[in-house]
Amino acid sequence: MNRSSTINYQLSTIPNLRVAIVADWLTATGGAERVIHALHEIYPDAPIYTSTYEDASRRLFKNADVRTSWMQKLPRQIRKHQLLTLPRQWYFGHLKLRDYDLVISAGSSEAKAVRAPDGKHINICYTPTLQYWVKPENYLQKGSDSLNPIWRTGLRVLMPFVQRWDYKAAQRPDKMYAISTEVQKRIKKFYDREPDGIVSPPADIERFLNKGAVERKGFVTWGRQVQHKRLDLAIQACNEAGVDLLVIGDGPEHTRLQAMAGPTIRFK
């Protein structure tokens, strides 16, 4: 992506501004990581603070100064972000970025808790944390991830605590921007604060320009195939209606989704 065609952020470019970028985690190459990458394009010299950093994200950030937490040293098997809620709360809650004029956090979980004692903190909120506020039932039911039973039990017990922590963390940023009108409503409802505006996520629109119209039938869905995206509902609906559905993407739910797909469902 290039800056002129994909970056819509109305952020300062004052010379010599000391900037830090903060992300919940960098473990894939999805929309969340691409927002961080867009910020990196604007501020290429800004360090990126995050909890864990996996190989799947390294292509995007090969030239970035990524600074991870102590959680990066944990064995890969237990470095799943679902299991590290409390450690991340402690890490970001105690991370004081004193040497920066501007701190920009972006995410849906704990990054917003970072402190910027001597500067300003802008948060780009993807959504109030889904598993605490928006779709807790999706996270508490059995899924395909073998670690889910441990995580589900812990989340049920800790839900009141993590909700209180998340609410307080959401009050820390000086400015909080939503990525959509729906997220704007959620911030008002769950965090009791008025968002300062909407910042649309970057989109690589050059890929779609001058492609021409193509006659197709049915529906298309794409994204990471993880439980909370509920792609199973799209497949179930198209199975029952007998209409075509093209499912694009991959993830831990891929095998389960293929198993439930009827003759009108295709995967790519």
Describe the role of every protein-language-model region.
Residues 104, 172-180, 246:
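A short beta-strand/loop micro-motif in the catalytic core of glycosyltransferases
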Residues 42-112:
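Active-site donor-binding segments of glycosyltransferases and PAPS-dependent sulfotransferases
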Residues 255-268:
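Nucleotide-activated donor-binding/catalytic signature segment of Leloir-type glycosyltransferases, i.e.
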Residues 102-104, 115-148:
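Active-site proximal beta-strand in glycosyltransferases
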Residues 25-26, 222-226, 251:
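Short donor-sugar binding/catalytic loops of nucleotide-sugar-dependent glycosyltransferases
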Residues 143-176:
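Membrane-proximal helix-turn-helix segments that form the acceptor-binding/catalytic region
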